[in-house]
Regions:
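Compositionally biased regions
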Residues: 15-16, 32, 65, 192
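Mature N-terminal, pre-catalytic/accessory segment of carbohydrate-active enzymes
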Residues: 20-44
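Extracellular parallel beta-helix/beta-solenoid repeat domains
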Residues: 38, 44-554
Length: 554
């Protein structure tokens, strides 16, 4: 009888657990809504319909899981959600066609279960906006026709120029001597490329951004194109050239105004912008995230058109761990805020500040209660006091979306020297995150490895920087060009391995680890920029396998 009672209790307890799990989760099987893999059909309209249903049916305390079956899903612009997004460090071209637009979500998980999401045209694959406690996991993002054209050097003749062969997936045409890459609703011409060694996949030594003169080309036979004016003796037969533009309309994943986001086991194989761009978000964890090739046998040599991951004006803690970042055309990670340039001193408590860079404007900069400080642009001297925003409004627009200028009122009197004609910027200290960048591999990419510009603690540990063609780690800060804040006060760089970084020269790349704020008038600087006011910058227990390049520049 005693055993029977125990058995009944066990069964009841198990049932209660199942019931509790059922009540705490609402699972949406995408296949129940017509979203099935490997059919070659346009998933965009069906996905948009499902997301609207999930958004409408959200309930407090219930986790909503959108679950896909493994396989390939094709997304086209037709039937996709259209959104106006102003995205930091991207081209502000709108509207954008969004494959999966997750907005105003709470406790929602998108679980791909190994799904391969393939996009067509010029799309923003996934957005997560104004959401909390959400996640994306177990899926990959790619495009059917990348806007980058990969070609192979077949012959390099000093007199006849270069004979090259486009990769099999490049849908090209030659019109009036111009080589044109074609996709769904777009065409692309090129004048620059990134050369890769065809055997090692490393960016070739001392090539950087190579000019590729592919004007007046002729197609000698299908798949073989002669560029008589493209002459560069560094490019041997067998070299792979990644032809790229400077456009970056959208990242693969766009995050804005989110809180507590987890992205796990997501791979981005290509995007015309960055892999992931997060702005004005709090607490982000990337685990096993990759901007990477599809494996060692992938015939592509490239991934994203710009950075792998980028965090602009975030707060809380950013964790990026166990990731793979390779083949991207810019940095693996960049963490910063944005300076506004002071355009006008309205009164002793009020200024007008402006977003200055053409790829960073149109989004929120600050809120009432935020702490700010002023900086002199040409010396990067930070004024000693901090101020609290009592009021902030867009100045040149009715709403924050699309605004370049803000009128900002502060609690204390602003120093008399802060004037437009004196060249000052203002930094928001409240939107600056702590960072952990750990156990990641960064390899075979253009430009730099990891960039940090935040006064909060930064730990960079147990990473492998393998042939980053520029600086591996950069502590920057710039109130003159990119306008990316701010000073680093507490940085630990430990137990990392660096192999042959700095094989080419790019902006701010003076050593393997480069502490390089942009200071136009260094002689006029009165104080330091990075370090101090905290732990400072500690570099310990790292391994450097290098050639005749400096390890540290400051």
């Amino acid at each position: 009888m005693k055993h029977l009672i125990i058995a009944i209790i066990t069964i009841l307890t198990s049932s209660m657990c199942v019931m509790a799990q059922t009540r705490s989760e609402q699972i949406y099987e995408a296949s129940d809504y017509g979203i099935v893999p490997d059919k070659g059909k346009n998933t965009s309209p069906l996905m948009d319909k499902l997301i609207k249903k999930v958004q409408k049916e959200q309930k407090a305390g219930i986790k909503s899981i959108i679950r896909l079956k493994p396989g390939r899903y094709d997304f086209h612009e037709t039937g996709a959600a259209q959104r106006t997004y102003y995205i930091s460090n991207h081209d502000q071209t709108n509207p954008k066609h969004v494959g999966i637009a997750l907005e105003e979500m709470s406790n929602v998980i998108l679980d791909g279960q190994g799904a391969q999401l393939v996009f067509h045209g010029r799309m923003l694959p996934i957005s997560l906006v104004r959401s909390q406690d959400c996640g994306i996991q177990n899926l990959s993002i790619d495009f059917e026709h990348p806007h980058i054209a990969q070609v192979k050097v077949v012959e390099n003749n000093p007199e006849k120029g270069i004979l090259f062969q486009p990769a099999p997936w490049v849908d090209y045409k030659v019109v009036k001597g111009e080589f044109i890459n074609c996709g769904e609703g777009w065409e692309m011409k090129y004048s620059f490329g990134i050369p890769f060694d065809g055997d090692t996949r490393h960016v070739m030594y001392n090539t950087g951004d190579t000019r590729c003169n592919i004007n007046e080309v002729t197609e000698e036979k299908p798949g073989l194109i002669r560029a008589p004016h493209w002459k560069d003796d560094r490019l041997k037969a067998g070299s792979i050239i990644v032809l790229r533009s400077w456009e970056r309309p959208a990242p693969a994943i766009f995050m804005s105004h989110d809180t507590n986001t987890c992205i796990e086991r997501v791979k981005v194989h290509y995007a015309e912008g960055m892999g992931l761009l997060a702005q004005l978000c709090e607490d982000i964890t990337l685990t096993g995230f990759g901007v990477c090739l599809k494996g060692v046998d992938d015939p592509r040599f490239f991934t994203t058109q710009a950075d792998a991951t980028h965090f602009s004006g975030c707060k809380g803690k950013i964790i990026s761990q166990d990731g793979l970042y390779e083949g991207m055309m810019d940095d693996a990670i960049n963490v910063h805020g944005t300076y506004l340039r002071i355009m006008k001193r309205v009164d002793n408590h009020t200024v007008i500040g402006r977003y200055m860079h053409d790829q960073s404007w149109g989004f929120e900069w600050g809120r009432k209660g935020d702490q700010v400080q002023f900086i002199r642009s040409n010396t990067m001297d930070i004024l000693p006091d901090t101020y609290t925003i009592t009021d902030i409004k867009p100045y040149d627009k009715e709403t924050t979306d699309g605004a370049r200028e803000f009128i900002i009122t502060l609690d204390k009197e602003i120093p008399q020297r802060v004037k437009a004609e004196e060249g000052y910027g203002v930094e928001n200290l409240s939107w600056a995150p702590e960072v952990l960048f750990a156990r990641n591999t960064i390899r075979n990419n253009r430009a730099r490895g990891a960039l940090f510009s935040t006064p909060q603690p930064v730990i960079v540990e147990d990473n492998f920087f393998d042939h980053t063609s520029g600086t591996a780690i950069l502590l920057c800060g710039d109130c003159n060009g990119w306008y990316e804040t701010g000073a680093c006060r507490d940085v630990t760089i430990r137990r990392n391995r660096f192999v042959n970084a700095l094989t080419s020269q790019y902006q701010f790349t003076s050593a393997i680890i480069s502490i390089y704020p942009e200071i136009p008038n260094l002689r006029g600087q009165e104080g330091f920029f990075h370090g101090g006011n905290g732990k400072g910058i500690v570099i310990e227990d790292n391994e450097f396998d290098t050639f005749d390049k400096p390890i540290l520049y400051a």
